[in-house]
């Protein structure tokens, strides 16, 4: 529950620092039991994972129902299967931590952050990866600790956030003869967190994040209901909404406007009429725009792409999404999961981009992150 609550929405970020504590304590107590321990360590992690992911990714059932055209029962079944699969990784964490505790005693709890990061990396890599709901994301709105990500990345940030949970487990789990070691290790965990937060706070206050030339950027969110997005009856209204908001932002003197992923209600390079209408309106606004749109190349390549258009209406660069969403944008191991074609028909034919691309905007170069 703490893991789910710490994530963006409801974003109770402080809970992230202690969210693994209850699981670590439960696993430590289980590891102290005489063998055989049975399936208890695995089940502890599995239940933790089920609650965690049910609270964070159950909304995918709506995506399957709206875009996949599935009935509610089947959509919930598939979302449940996804949640069950993701829950296996906290279960693996519990098994690995139990093994470490059996060999090294309670002080081995100091390894909990490393083991957790290992299972996150595994989850983000296997079967093309599912890198959502990483523990480090709980601090996405907390600037001081977030600075550590510039040095150690998201997985390192997850490990940092897990350290206080390890410290709590070290302090509350009894182990005769090893009290001094437990206290020293817990203090070391908290000291690492303290150093990272102090350094991050100093970095934020120093203005290092604002060093160099700056630009004013407007983010345009059309808030288009998903049921209307690809409905031809709403195409004109959607385009009007985005271009109107862009013109409004331009009047406020911004240097760049950014639209969301797949924001155009048409395929950019296949619908010349709407592309020209959009181009003319953006030229009138007089500001560069980064926008998301589908792109078709040849008879079989279909990309989720981002484009940058300069103030004169010329496309100056594009980026094709490289890490696609399984079952949303493509079907992994299609030869084995051929039966899934009908579940995601029309939404799984995207091709993966092959290279990283920086988009030029004036003297700046932009890196575009597309969902997932």
Regions from the PLM with identified roles:
Residues 1-204, 240:
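Membrane-embedded alpha-helical bundles of multi-pass enzymes
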Residues 202-372:
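Soluble catalytic domains of enzymes that build or remodel membrane lipids, polysaccharides, and related
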């Amino acid at each position: 529950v703490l893991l789910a609550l710490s994530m963006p929405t409801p974003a109770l970020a402080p809970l992230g620092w202690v969210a693994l504590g209850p699981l670590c304590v439960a696993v430590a107590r289980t590891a102290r039991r005489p063998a055989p321990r049975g399936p208890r360590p695995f089940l502890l992690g599995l239940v933790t994972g089920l609650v965690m992911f049910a609270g964070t990714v159950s909304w995918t059932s709506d995506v399957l129902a709206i875009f996949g055209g599935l009935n509610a029962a089947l959509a919930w079944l598939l979302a449940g299967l996804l949640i069950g699969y993701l829950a296996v990784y906290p279960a693996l964490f519990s098994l690995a931590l139990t093994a470490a505790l059996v060999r090294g005693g309670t002080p081995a709890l100091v390894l909990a952050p490393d083991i957790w990061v290992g299972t996150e990396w595994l989850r983000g890599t296997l079967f093309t990866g599912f890198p959502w709901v990483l523990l480090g994301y709980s601090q996405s709105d907390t600037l001081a600790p977030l600075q550590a990500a510039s040095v150690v990345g998201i997985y390192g940030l997850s490990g940092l956030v897990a350290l206080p949970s390890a410290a709590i487990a070290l302090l509350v789990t009894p182990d005769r003869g090893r009290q001094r070691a437990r206290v020293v290790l817990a203090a070391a965990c908290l000291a690492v967190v303290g150093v990272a937060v102090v350094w991050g706070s100093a970095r934020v206050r120093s203005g290092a994040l604002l060093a160099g030339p700056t630009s004013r950027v407007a983010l345009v969110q059309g808030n288009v209901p998903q049921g209307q997005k690809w409905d031809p009856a709403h195409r004109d209204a959607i385009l009007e909404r985005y271009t109107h908001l862009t013109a409004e932002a331009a009047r406020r003197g911004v240097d760049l406007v950014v639209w969301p992923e797949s924001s155009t209600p048409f395929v950019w390079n296949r619908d010349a009429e709407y592309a020209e209408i959009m181009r003319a309106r953006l030229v009138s606004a007089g500001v560069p725009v980064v926008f998301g749109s589908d792109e078709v190349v040849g008879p079989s390549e279909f990309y989720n792409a981002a484009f940058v258009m300069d103030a004169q209406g010329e496309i100056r660069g594009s980026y094709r999404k490289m890490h696609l969403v399984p079952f949303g944008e493509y079907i992994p191991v299609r030869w084995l999961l051929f039966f899934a074609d009908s579940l995601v028909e029309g939404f799984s034919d995207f091709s993966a981009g092959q290279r990283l691309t920086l988009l030029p905007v004036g003297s700046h170069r932009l890196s575009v992150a597309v969902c997932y």
